């Protein structure tokens, strides 16, 4: 019997007093797609960073083709044929797509001169397998979904024997995801071994052969997916039953709350046009649509992050002169970006500093000195409410898992006691247990009278969480769906231009 391509035995990793991994095992066979599952903070990303040479284990052994190895750096991992596609974007924004794709490959091959024409030709050939993206474009000019495809294409240039994909479809459209799945199946057929990290059970059961589950930094089990159901995997991940992923929606008698936010005919002259809708007090209003439809741009236009050429935003009936995000925060409107590391959090700063950063004025005394005790109390309160897994509020945010970083980003917005919260992909890349916690928090905030707008590309989240749903198509409101009218088919028809609903003028 052939040796596994990768064997992990007894690996432990400490970050100070925090034990991120405790004596874990993992085996990857040749030509298999192996799912790695667990809640955020379970240790998945830590192990993948060890395999990819980003981190060094405190204890344990790694074998490649049966031989013990020390993977001391990402370059050493690449030499062994191991590639990692991070969940978070790690590209050079001012370089072109082609330059980003071949940066690691050219470093590895050490060519004395760069043939840019050949580089662009080879890069375009790889990129065409995923999407029609011009590799001469600057990465900073691409949307997040296209940047994620560049990350994947970059890994495909390395001729990997082991490819690690960490939430690769989190920012992709359905069409883009299907193209990626086709490539994964081709790679598998050619003997490439793939570690697939995802919280999307449908993807795992469609693509993967086996699943390994981690919980609280420990190895739980490895099973053939053919022998399991999605509920089996979830139970192994969380160690408990998830009884209700989505809290109860508003009852019919609760849906008549007064309008708290009015968006009247706003346009930016390019990405969204004549957008009109209302948000009721205590309501969770979902906004759906295809990636690139203008959902994010509408939210940015409301809160001063994107200039508007027309229209008015009113809060409690009063027009708000919002020209910058600071104006929106002062008025009581906050926005959680879909790009949490680019716009949502400060990785090098502490958890306490991140949570308090939007309202430092309230935490300073008459002479402008920060009240550290008040800051700590504020941060500790919100970190506990959102169940942030941490060693302490003074820990840097970069030490947290992706899901816990997202919780800190949400806590930062909540700390200013907003009247309206706009959340763009609030649970992207977060495990099922953390999703349930965040959904519970959102419903509690709505019950306290806050108006909440949720933009999501996850259909179950839109349908399960929203009291009312707007669908955006080509920068315009294509229609509105009440709780009773919501269905996946109805959303898809509106998003693709195949159906109609009540006019946007009646969206409130």
UniProtKB/Swiss-Prot annotation:
GO MF, one annotated term: ATP hydrolysis activity
Membrane topology: Peripheral membrane protein
Catalyzed reactions per annotation: D-ribose(out) + ATP + H2O = D-ribose(in) + ADP + phosphate + H(+)
Ranges where the ABC transporter domain occurs: 6-241, 254-499
Cellular localisation: Cell inner membrane
SUPFAM superfamilies the UniProt entry points to: P-loop containing nucleoside triphosphate hydrolases
Annotated positions binding ATP: 38-45
Top-rank EC class of the record's enzyme: translocase
Keywords: ATP-binding, Cell inner membrane, Cell membrane, Membrane, Nucleotide-binding, Plasmid, Repeat, Sugar transport, Translocase, Transport
Biological role: Part of the ABC transporter complex RbsABC involved in ribose import. Responsible for energy coupling to the transport system.
Entries under PANTHER family matching the protein: CARBOHYDRATE TRANSPORT ATP-BINDING PROTEIN MG119-RELATED (PTHR43790), GALACTOFURANOSE TRANSPORTER ATP-BINDING PROTEIN YTFR (PTHR43790:SF9)
Subunit and partners: The complex is composed of an ATP-binding protein (RbsA), two transmembrane proteins (RbsC) and a solute-binding protein (RbsB).
Family membership: Belongs to the ABC transporter superfamily. Ribose importer (TC 3.A.1.2.1) family.
Protein name per UniProt: Ribose import ATP-binding protein RbsA 2
Biological source species: Rhizobium etli (strain ATCC 51251 / DSM 11541 / JCM 21823 / NBRC 15573 / CFN 42)
Recorded name of the encoding gene: rbsA2
